[in-house]
Structure formats: structure tokens, C-alpha cells
Amino acid sequence: MEDDLYARIANIELQQAAIATLEPLRRIKIKEGLQKVLEENVGKENYDRNRLEQEIIFYIEKIDISEEQVRLKNHCEYFKDVLKENTISKGKKLSFILQEIGREINTTGSKAYDSDIQKCVVLMKDELEKSKEQILNVL
């Protein structure tokens, strides 16, 4: 069972690495998409480009997923550390850590606005659910 849980967390970490490679492209797509919508609705010359840059920065900060990714990485590491512990009663602790992992995955998904990142989130959720099922078998 431990090997299966390690594999599930490793799969979550693989998807997280994929998200890290997609993140810079997502920011560019968001910026270009906002600019295109603005130009289509207002015109190319009818807006202040400096103001647009400020608004784009604000928007990108609002949907930034870097904090969630850092916390997700930390939770995965903590999960593996607890899994290594040689104690009998680690099931509840692992269950709580999986809840935290789930929160970070869900927040990433809700902030992403990117289909490729959403695919990674779905795969991570699948691995998370399988991990929860394994833990429930122990409890």
C-alpha cells in the first residue's frame, strides 16, 4: 500500500511539474487575450497602454497560482515524510494532509483559466481520490 501511495503522490508531482512548464505560456495567453478583447471592443488607439499594463498585472496577480504550487509541493513532501514514519497511527495524519493537497489542487484549478492546466488538475484530482481511498482502507 505504501508503494501505491508513493506512486500516487509522484504522479501528482509530475502533473505539478507540467503545470510549472505551462504557467509562463498561460500568462502570455491571458495578456494577449485581454489585449485582443480590448482592441476589438474599444479600438487599438482608444485606450491607454500603460493603464492596460497595470490592469493586466493586477489580473495576473489575482489568478497567480505560484503560492498554491509552493504549498502543494510542501504538502506532498510532508505526506512522503509521514508515510516513511515508523508509527502505527499515521493514517489520520495522512488523511489530513491529503485534504490540504486537495485544497491546493482545487484552488489551482479554479484560478487557472487554461485548458492544459485544467487537464493536469483533473489528473491530480484522480490520483488524490485514489490516495484517499487507500487511506480509508487503513483507517
Roles of regions detected by a PLM:
Residues 1-139:
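N-terminal intrinsically disordered, cationic/polar leader segments
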